[in-house]
Amino acid sequence: LSNIVVLDHIQDTNNFGAIIRSAAAFNFNIVCLPKKRSVNITERTFAVSSGGLENVSIVFYNSIFSLIKKLKALDYWTVGLEMDTEEDISNVNLNDQKVALFIGSEESGLSNEIQKKLDLISKINMDNKIESLNASVAAGIAMNHFFKKSS
């Protein structure tokens, strides 16, 4: 099985398309998103993904908590991206384990309830001139990290 990206209530079509594009580029062959309260696949998604949608499977889930449980049962290492944590993603080495990367909403990130269920919460180290990265940029950096570690 391949690496997976799990989106939790991403709302912006451009972010969604860019995440799909990065997922295809870095061998994250499945993108999961909630059935409700999430972005839709639109013509804009196709355009921004630049062919990524043809190389990535989109899977819808009902409950993120059930999904986390299923992924762990399939031996995925569940990793969330957040700003307020000590663990720098560049130090994370999962020794070729399958990764399920969790990306929270643009507004509020991953909820504390979700974070508690994941194996690891990590951040992208950056200069403090900027408070945060765009969700699709952060997702792309994290996917590239795991792609390089598995190459």
Role assignments for model-derived ranges:
Residues 1-86:
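RNA substrate-binding interface of SAM-dependent RNA methyltransferases
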Residues 19, 110-113, 142:
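Conserved sugar-transfer catalytic core signal across GT-A, GT-B, and GT-C glycosyltransferases
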Residues 25, 46-52, 115-151:
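Structured adenosyl-cofactor binding patch, chiefly the S-adenosyl-L-methionine
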Residues 35-39, 61-65, 109-113, 131-136:
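Short C-terminal domain-edge/linker segments immediately following a structured domain
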Residues 51-57, 98-104, 147:
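Short, structured secondary-structure boundary patches
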Residues 79-134:
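Active-site/ligand-binding-proximal alpha/beta "capping" segment
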